[in-house]
Amino acid sequence: MGSPVFRRPFCHLSTYSLLWAIAAVALSTAQVEVVTQDERKLLHTTASLRCSLKTTQEPLIVTWQKKKAVGPENMVTYSKAHGVVIQPTYKDRINITELGLLNTSITFWNTTLDDEGCYMCLFNMFGSGKVSGTACLTLYVQPIVHLHYNYFEDHLNITCSATARPAPAISWKGTGSGIENSTESHSHSNGTTSVTSILRVKDPKTQVGKEVICQVLYLGNVIDYKQSLDKGFWFSVPLLLSIVSLVILLVLISILLYWKRHRNQERGESSQGMQRMK
């Protein structure tokens, strides 16, 4: 009679080994850290994004992808076997400027609005799959500010406009009573936004010699733009009509006097001629 064969412990041993292997892979993956840093750069300049893999195990390949609504888009890869491979869409626009498998950087030669967004760096690790990090690029345009004022018939307009990316905010300092404020914004195709704020002063004479400050809030900083109000020209419609009427009257009187004088001279000359003929 043959002795029985026990297979159950072997199954348990295989299961335990598999579990230990999975745990080891998970532990090694969990210990891998990807360090990234978001960047804010001036539009139409050079910008770089960097990823660092904190591990002693060197990955096989590094891939950079751009995050999009429809899914990530491959941009460029680097490996020791194939070097740098740039996708056709991104040729002449970007390159990997730090050739490494643990530290990698991509550089945009001349940033455009399409380059703004978030990017993933993927490290393909042997035995533990892919490890990724995300770095975001934000583009800005420095504000261009204009501050001026105009006098009208019965009020004064003080206008402050700022154009920038992202959109700036405008506030006023040094204003008094009897002043109305209106603000509007307009987006441009180049990615900038213009914000215009107008102060309407009902009694301009009260603001002569005073300093008005337009405060532009941009990226957490407040910049003051100052304007001193000089004496302007105030007039009303009745006063203007009176002045014009007076000028017209003076012109008519001058014409009438000139005509009378010229007529008297002609009469005098004709009477003298008749006396000589006699």
UniProtKB/Swiss-Prot annotation:
Descriptive protein name: OX-2 membrane glycoprotein
Assembly notes: CD200 and CD200R1 interact via their respective N-terminal Ig-like domains.
Range of residues in the leader sequence: 1-30
Occurrences of domain Ig-like C2-type (ranges): 142-232
Membrane topology: Single-pass type I membrane protein
Topological domains annotated Cytoplasmic: 260-278
Compartments, record wording: Cell membrane
GO cellular component: axon; cell body; cell surface; neuron projection; neuronal cell body; plasma membrane; postsynaptic density; presynaptic active zone
Tissue expression: Found on the surface of neurons, thymocytes, B-cells and follicular dendritic cells.
Ig-like V-type domain mapped to chain residues: 31-141
Native source species: Rattus norvegicus (Rat)
Disulfide bonds: 51-121, 118-136, 160-214
GO MF entries: cell-cell adhesion mediator activity; protein binding involved in heterotypic cell-cell adhesion
